[in-house]
């Protein structure tokens, strides 16, 4: 099955503490979750690793968010949108459902 959300897609958060925020997808995990730049920031308590010269402390990093809680952002309409699939020149491509514009 083809992925509706892929790396480097511009997405908008639909639910949760970061609702309404936009960001770029950094990574898509196989568990149905994605990591989005600047979204769902958590504080991680990190131990120092002297062998690698890494200091310890509290580090902020992006945590995974469920794919169902985000939607792809359509820059043409300025809103969240749904993704469809169709064949163009023998290739399967993604398109926005609202205006039928091909993605990338």
Swiss-Prot record:
GO CC list: cytosol; ribonucleoprotein complex; ribosome
Pfam families: KOW (PF00467), ribosomal_L24 (PF17136)
Swiss-Prot/TrEMBL GO biological process terms: translation
Keyword terms, alphabetized: Ribonucleoprotein, Ribosomal protein, RNA-binding, rRNA-binding
Family: Belongs to the universal ribosomal protein uL24 family.
PANTHER family registered for this protein in UniProt: MITOCHONDRIAL RIBOSOMAL PROTEIN L24
Function: One of two assembly initiator proteins, it binds directly to the 5'-end of the 23S rRNA, where it nucleates assembly of the 50S subunit.
Protein name as catalogued: Large ribosomal subunit protein uL24
Underlying gene: rplX
């Amino acid at each position: 099955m083809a992925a509706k959300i892929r790396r480097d897609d511009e997405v908008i958060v639909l639910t949760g503490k970061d609702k309404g925020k936009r960001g770029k997808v950094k990574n898509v995990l196989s568990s149905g979750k994605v990591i989005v730049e600047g979204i769902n920031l958590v504080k991680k308590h990190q131990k120092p690793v002297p062998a690698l010269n890494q200091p310890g402390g509290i580090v902020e990093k992006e945590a995974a968010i469920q794919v169902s809680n985000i939607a792809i952002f359509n820059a043409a309409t300025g809103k969240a949108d749904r993704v469809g699939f169709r064949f163009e020149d023998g290739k399967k491509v993604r398109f926005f459902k609202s205006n039928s514009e091909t993605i990338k």
